[in-house]
Every structure is written in structure tokens, then in C-alpha cells.
């Protein structure tokens, strides 16, 4: 596969401090061998942070300087709303500072005074699971079995198992499932993509039982790319066209904009 030169220039760099073997040993000992206690400036290669670290364009930085800070009626909100509608097709938009806040808004609303309800997903991301359980719900992971085999090759290892989903609905009852979800791509499942057929099938099964279908859309563009390159019938479609179809099956979504929107904050 040939890769063209990047169509951009990098104008700003951030220095990263290097450490010696002995310095790293001292740091990990001081942290009690808990990597979450290590100061970030002591980390040379960060394999944990998965978002909010991409370089932003000159137009993005300029846009921050021209930002409308009006308490209501901000022109930036209307631009944000327009872009959400163009990509996702949803009329109602609530901006948040990151995805986990959007999750808490959703689950604190649908689970309020209704403890013990079940939220199925292919795999819940850790903040999604935390927000479900903090608000009294039960998070159920129903990813296909092959996803757990690291040596197996499959185009869409992020798919939800529709048989497991159907069994769960029969077991707990549709009235005890306020929404069903898909995370695209499947972050806690190794970032594996979800096929359009699986998205469509999930929507059809949930809607058959009058259960709303929501998408955790953090990496929707990457998922659309995998659909374009791996799923029959989508090679000639644009990423936007594929994204439009993905979300046409959903009743709503949450998203951290710190991933595929390539910004350092937002949701």
C-alpha cells in the first residue's frame, strides 16, 4: 500500500524529557509500583492516553481566538449544531466538555429512580460502565466470541452478538432495557470495528422490542473507514455517506470529540 506525503506542516513541537534506567527505577519505586501514580512528565512513551493529544490545525487554533463566548446564542454553538446535523443527522444537540459527561447526562436521566435496569453493549468503555453502574444500572457486554481470541483474524471483531442480545432481551424483558448501545469502534475490545450489517441488525432487533438504540460514537470516522475498506458494497461510498447511514439507524448517540474530531476537548 502506498502512502502519500502528509498534506500539512507541523509548526509546533512539544519537548519530551528522556530518562535513564536508574531514573525510571527511582520513579516507579516512588510511585509504589503503581503506574497511575507516575507524573506524566516522567513518561517518555504514553501508551495509555488515547485522546485529546492530536495536533490541531492552524484554523482550529485561530477559531479558538475568534470564539464567541456569549452566554446564549453563541455563533459557535450554531456552527457546532450544523456540523452535528450534517454528520449524524440528529436535531437535538447538547455540547459537553468530554464524552464521560455526555454519558452521565444520558444515564442519570434514563436510570433515574429506576435501579437495576440493564444496558447492553458490544463492550462498554470503562467510563461508560462507570456511569451506568454509578446511576444504578447494570452494564452487559455482548461482543462476539471471536473478539476474545487475539490470534483470530476477522474483519469486524467489534460486532455485538445478536443472538446474545436477543437472549438478554428475552431473559430480562424489554421493559428493563431502557436503551441498547454499540461502541464504534469497540474501544475496550481492542479498537475493533463494527460492520454496517451489525449496526443495522442491532437497530432492527432493539426497535422490534421498542428499545431505543444509541451509539457511543467516539471513533465513528475510523469505523466508517473500516466499513469502506472491508465491507462489500461500501468501497465507492464516502466516509460521510457511510457515517450518515450508520447514524440513520440510531435514535441518539454520545461522543467524546477528543478522538475522531481531532480536538483537545469537547463532546
Label for each model-derived stretch:
Residues 2-33, 37-39, 43-56, 60, ...:
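Conserved PLP-enzyme active-site core in the AAT-like
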Amino acid at each position: 500500500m502506498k502512502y502519500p506525503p502528509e498534506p500539512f506542516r507541523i509548526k509546533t513541537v512539544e519537548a519530551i524529557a528522556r530518562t535513564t534506567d536508574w531514573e525510571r527505577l527511582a520513579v516507579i519505586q516512588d510511585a509504589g509500583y503503581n503506574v497511575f501514580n507516575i507524573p506524566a512528565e516522567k513518561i517518555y512513551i504514553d501508551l495509555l492516553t488515547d485522546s485529546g493529544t492530536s495536533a490541531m490545525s492552524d484554523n482550529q487554533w485561530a477559531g479558538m481566538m475568534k470564539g464567541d463566548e456569549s452566554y446564549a446564542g453563541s455563533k459557535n454553538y450554531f456552527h457546532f449544531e450544523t456540523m452535528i446535523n450534517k454528520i449524524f443527522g440528529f436535531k437535538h444537540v447538547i455540547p459537553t466538555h468530554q464524552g464521560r459527561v455526555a454519558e452521565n447526562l444520558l444515564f442519570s436521566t434514563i436510570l433515574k429512580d429506576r435501579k437495576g435496569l440493564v444496558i447492553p453493549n458490544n463492550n462498554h468503555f470503562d467510563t461508560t460502565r462507570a456511569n451506568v453502574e454509578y446511576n444504578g444500572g447494570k452494564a452487559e457486554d455482548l461482543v462476539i466470541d471471536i473478539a476474545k481470541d487475539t490470534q483470530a483474524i476477522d474483519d469486524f471483531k467489534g460486532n455485538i452478538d445478536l443472538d446474545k442480545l436477543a437472549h438478554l432481551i428475552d431473559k430480562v424483558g424489554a421493559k428493563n432495557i431502557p436503551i441498547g448501545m454499540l461502541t464504534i469502534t469497540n474501544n475496550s475490545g481492542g479498537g475493533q470495528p463494527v460492520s454496517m450489517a451489525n449496526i443495522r441488525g442491532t437497530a432492527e432487533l432493539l426497535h422490534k422490542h421498542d428499545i431505543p438504540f444509541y451509539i457511543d460514537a467516539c471513533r465513528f470516522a475510523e469505523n466508517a473507514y473500516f466499513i469502506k475498506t472491508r465491507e462489500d458494497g461500501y468501497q465507492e461510498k464516502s466516509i460521510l455517506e457511510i457515517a450518515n447511514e450508520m447514524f440513520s439507524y440510531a435514535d441518539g448517540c454520545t461522543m467524546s470529540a477528543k478522538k475522531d474530531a481531532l480536538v483537545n476537548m469537547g463532546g
